[in-house]
């Protein structure tokens, strides 16, 4: 039996948006069963709600952004990843600005926030999206694919012509569970190259970026004094992003995901392609007295 989950208590955080550079106040609130993840722009009059829905994705350049009723919510992927990692189904995310705080560039601070708020089980079974048929999308040599699998596993391969990202450190696989997510994925930070800085600034991107919230590389090395948290932190962060992007499907995935040089745009294209093909997936749940789901979530954390 795996039940839906929400937060036990309301919790708040503040930070800056990675791309906007704006200070933002964020409040995470409990939500009822079947509510899902809903963002709320409390700085707007009237307040606008934006569901965490792959069909509302309008921005995929260096982040995943949603738009609903004229209101934007930018850089949702790291919080969505943490929610997926801890199995939180229902939550209200109030924001005082259009972009979520970047924190340290990983999902670790969001994991800590969620655990600090406490996570409680609710009265209805959790709903999973079970992959029944292979679905694949491509963009040039980039590939993102879902395949049937008993559980949830993710594999990712990146290709960067950089001495700090050799081929042997460009591949990562994870058999998803809360424990594996927290230990192996959640601390991996977003990264960027000095050579791309001008391109980003011209487009008003990365304005809040610094070595406090990203790994920064020049042509030869990592510039952060503390170095890397994992030897292959770069590809692990790509899995972190993918877990967040895929959670916009509206439920936890049961299947195998494979990404080759994929990013936010292709991940979103994959989710949309899946949802559009009704023969390729089904809703499943595991009510009391039935089989256990093939994915392990940590016991609820009662704060």
From Swiss-Prot:
GO terms for cellular component: membrane. Its cofactor is Zn(2+). GO terms for biological process: lipid A biosynthetic process. Keywords: Hydrolase, Lipid A biosynthesis, Lipid biosynthesis, Lipid metabolism, Metal-binding, Zinc. It catalyses: a UDP-3-O-[(3R)-3-hydroxyacyl]-N-acetyl-alpha-D-glucosamine + H2O = a UDP-3-O-[(3R)-3-hydroxyacyl]-alpha-D-glucosamine + acetate. Zn(2+) binds at residues 78, 237, 241. InterPro entries: Ribosomal_Su5_D2-typ_SF, UDP-acyl_GlcNac_deAcase, UDP-acyl_GlcNac_deAcase_C, UDP-acyl_N-AcGlcN_deAcase_N. Pathway: Glycolipid biosynthesis; lipid IV(A) biosynthesis; lipid IV(A) from (3R)-3-hydroxytetradecanoyl-[acyl-carrier-protein] and UDP-N-acetyl-alpha-D-glucosamine: step 2/6. Its EC number is 3.5.1.108. One of its GO terms (molecular function) is metal ion binding. Gene3D superfamilies: lpxc deacetylase, domain 1, lpxc deacetylase, domain 2. It comes from the Bacteria. It holds the Pfam family LpxC. The active site is at 264 (proton donor). It is an enzyme of class 3 (hydrolase). Catalyzes the hydrolysis of UDP-3-O-myristoyl-N-acetylglucosamine to form UDP-3-O-myristoylglucosamine and acetate, the committed step in lipid A biosynthesis. Belongs to the LpxC family. HAMAP family: LpxC (MF_00388). This is UDP-3-O-acyl-N-acetylglucosamine deacetylase. The lineage of its organism: Bacteria, Pseudomonadati, Pseudomonadota, Gammaproteobacteria, Lysobacterales.
